[in-house]
Structures are given as C-alpha cells and as structure tokens.
Amino acid sequence: MQALAEQTETKNVYDVLDFNLWYGNNQALKNISLQLKEKHVTAIIGPSGCGKSTFIKTLNLMSRLNPDIRMAGELNFRGENLLTTSMDLAELRKAVGMVFQKPNPFPKSIYENVAYGPRIHGIRKKKELDEIVESSLKGAFLWEEVKDRLNKNALSLSGGQQQRLCIARALATKPEVLLMDEPTSALDPISTTKVEELITSLRDSYTIVIVTHNMQQAARISDETAFFYMGELVEIGPTQRIFSNPEHKRTEDYVSGQFG
C-alpha cells in the first residue's frame, strides 16, 4: 500500500522534453525539460522576460493564438505530445484551466460567469448548473460573500473577489490542472492572502502551476519551484531545497535577491 501511495504521489501530469519556442526568429524558450507532478503546486520563478509566462501558456496551447509562434520538442500531457496530437483544443482547455494576472470576469452576472463553461460543454439543466455554480464558488472561497447576489454584475465585485470568481469559473469545468499567471500581482495584501489560502486548499485536488515574481509567495505555497533565466530552465526541485540549498549559483543569486 505504501509503495502504491508513493507511486500515485509522484505521477507526472506533464512531461516536457527538449521543448523550444520561437517568436518569429527570436527564440524565447530553449531546450526546456521538466516534469510537473500530479496534485502538486509548482511555482515558476525568474526575472522579467525570462520566459515564465510564455512557458505556462504553452501548457494549454494558448500560445497557438499567436500565428508567429513556432514550437518544437515534446510537450506531453497525460502521455500525449500536445505538439503532434489531434486532441481537441476545447477539451484540452477544459482539462487545463487558466487564471490570468489581471482579473477578467465577463460583463455578466456572477452566476453566468461560473455557469458559462459548463454550458459551453453541454450542461443545460438549471439544477445541475446551480450545483456547479455553488460548489465552484465554495471551492474558490467566495460563496458566502456572494450567495445572496448571484444575479449582480461580476464587475461590481472587488478586485480580489473578481480574481476568486475567475478561479471559480476555471473550477466549474472540473479541470485536472490550474495554470495561474501571477494571479495576485494586481491585488492588495489581504486579497493576496485569501488567494494564497485558496491555492493551498486546492492543492490536494488539482495540479497547480503558478508564475510569480514574489519569492516569499513561492516559498509559502509551492511544493516545487522551477527557476527560469533568459529562456532556459536553470533548475527545478523541491521548494525548500531551491531556497535553502540550490544547485546553481545563478539560482542562489536570484532567490537571495542579488538580481531580479
């Protein structure tokens, strides 16, 4: 039983091998190889322009929205190379949700924001939608704050509430993976704390990949940390080791604040 538990714990959702990405003639990611573990929080850190956000957007192929992008290598999700698979993009993005730096709720009601995804994927019965909306808002620590005003415009919420609504919207499609691109950088400290608590509560149910500039945040909430520099992966490992005993001097210099 113990061996089975260890095997389950270390299952990889993503296996990236020699992955390269170009914007036109400019190479933005160079020979990236890493594994992202199931039901772990992985923080992606590094200075501005190092490729963090570019990398995370490849994980659900949002990068394909840019016609100038070219990719090579292996980007394996559930054992399928996303660069060669015929997997439907809508199904991929249902399985791999995305939360952006700036809260981006739809200009619709709170209810409709959360129900939108399930409707797109064929759920029509009001009772079922009601249950999904409630469970998703509870999962995002927002239900108690909005349960009596679900028909209010989502844009009437505070910035922190809007970001948690966007997380609820991502949860509503029952994803396997949540990608978060600096989800707290536009929030005040109190809202940031709530989102960090939310991420901690979700880690047992979802694989989470978060881009952050905040070293303290990465140390607080992640199980593993990957350090990117100038389009390359310098190292990845358990967060405690990355911050206390990194293998590379460049990592040590970055996490100790000597450059950023």
Swiss-Prot record:
Organism: Shouchella clausii (strain KSM-K16)
Membrane topology: Peripheral membrane protein
Keywords for the protein's UniProt record, in alphabetical order: ATP-binding, Cell membrane, Membrane, Nucleotide-binding, Phosphate transport, Translocase, Transport
Span of domain ABC transporter: 8-255
Protein name: Phosphate import ATP-binding protein PstB 1
Positions contributing to ATP binding: 46-53
MF term (GO), any: ATP binding
Enzyme Commission number(s) of this protein: 7.3.2.1
Family the UniProt entry places it in: Belongs to the ABC transporter superfamily. Phosphate importer (TC 3.A.1.7) family.
Top EC category: translocase
Keyword Translocase included in the entry's annotation: yes
Domain of life: Bacteria
Subunit: The complex is composed of two ATP-binding proteins (PstB), two transmembrane proteins (PstC and PstA) and a solute-binding protein (PstS).
Chief place of localization: membrane
Function as written in the Swiss-Prot or TrEMBL entry: Part of the ABC transporter complex PstSACB involved in phosphate import. Responsible for energy coupling to the transport system.
SUPFAM superfamilies in the record: P-loop containing nucleoside triphosphate hydrolases
GO process annotations (BP): phosphate ion transmembrane transport
Taxonomic lineage from the root: Bacteria, Bacillati, Bacillota, Bacilli, Bacillales
Compartment list: Cell membrane
GO CC term, one of those recorded: plasma membrane
Reactions performed catalytically: phosphate(out) + ATP + H2O = ADP + 2 phosphate(in) + H(+)
